[in-house]
């Protein structure tokens, strides 16, 4: 189960996450470069966070190395050259597109950033997946390969991060996992409901932002740990795994 937390904004939290036992760490954190978001980070801060996270897999006192926490760059309808510049400056291995980027835009981005992994955020409401099927088909025709579709709630005028949940039952029945990229579930996920969401939707991964923030809107380390633990425990149960 791939677990990501989005909206990290300072090196103090990056250091805290990097210091966690590997089992309690998220696989990835999101660096939000959308200026319209309260979670937006500037380039200098992002550079510092990436540097800290890059050391999270280094050998400790035990002499054993572990997997580093990955930094994912999140963009919303940003100019192509800006995304390419950020990707190269920060050596980002994964980019998350959260706006209304066209298939043609994505194809050009993939060509410019050869080898980068792409996540496509899609916003879904009660009306269903609608146009996203044709969107993904057009991307395929252009040679675009997404590594995941991050499914969030459709909220008019918003690009995500609203705390609302997409219709889980609809995703469970209508998401064409055999044809489309792996489903990464987002939207309204918290430590207390991520297990139920995984049980109902069976996603390949989960993502949260507000679900692990405190009342002041700051990322809460304890909530992150609980979210990661609950997500991985639920994923193990859904595969029929048992302890021991």
Show where each model-derived region lies.
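N-terminal basic/disordered segments at the start of proteins
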Residues: 2-21
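Generic hydrophobic/aromatic pocket-lining and core-packing "Φ" positions
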Residues: 14, 46, 83-84, 106, ...
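Conserved, mostly hydrophobic/aromatic
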Residues: 17, 95, 149, 167, ...
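Glycine-rich phosphate-binding active-site loops on the catalytic face of alpha/beta enzymes
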Residues: 24-38, 96-102, 153-158, 201-225
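Conserved anion-binding
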Residues: 33-40, 50-57, 67-74, 78-185
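C-terminal helical cap(s) of enzyme catalytic domains, especially alpha/beta-barrels
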Residues: 45-53, 108-109, 209-244
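Intrinsically disordered, low-complexity segments used as extracellular stalks/linkers
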Residues: 55-67, 237, 241
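A C-terminal functional module that forms or caps the active site or interfaces directly
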Residues: 177-179, 183-200, 213
């Amino acid at each position: 189960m791939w677990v990501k937390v989005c909206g990290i904004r300072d090196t103090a939290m990056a250091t805290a996450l990097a210091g966690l036992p590997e089992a309690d760490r998220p696989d990835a954190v999101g660096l939000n470069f959308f200026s319209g978001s309260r979670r937006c980070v500037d380039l200098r801060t992002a550079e510092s966070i990436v540097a800290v996270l890059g050391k999270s897999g280094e050998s400790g006192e035990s002499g054993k190395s572990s997997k580093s926490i990955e930094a994912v760059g999140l963009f919303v309808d940003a100019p192509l050259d800006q995304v390419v510049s950020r990707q190269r400056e920060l050596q980002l291995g994964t980019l998350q597109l959260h706006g209304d980027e066209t298939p043609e835009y994505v194809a050009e981005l993939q060509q410019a950033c050869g080898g980068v992994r792409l996540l496509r955020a899609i916003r879904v409401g009660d009306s269903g997946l609608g146009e996203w099927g044709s969107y993904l088909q057009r991307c395929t025709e252009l040679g675009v390969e997404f590594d995941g579709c991050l499914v969030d709630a459709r909220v008019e005028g918003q690009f995500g991060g609203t705390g609302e949940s997409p219709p889980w039952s609809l995703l469970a029945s209508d998401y064409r996992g055999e044809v489309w990229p792996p489903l990464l579930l987002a939207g309204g996920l918290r430590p207390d409901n991520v297990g139920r969401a995984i049980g109902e939707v069976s996603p390949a991964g989960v993502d949260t932002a507000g679900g692990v923030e405190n009342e002041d809107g700051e990322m809460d380390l304890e909530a992150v740990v609980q979210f990661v633990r609950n997500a991985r425990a639920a994923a193990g149960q859904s595969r029929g795994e048992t302890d021991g």
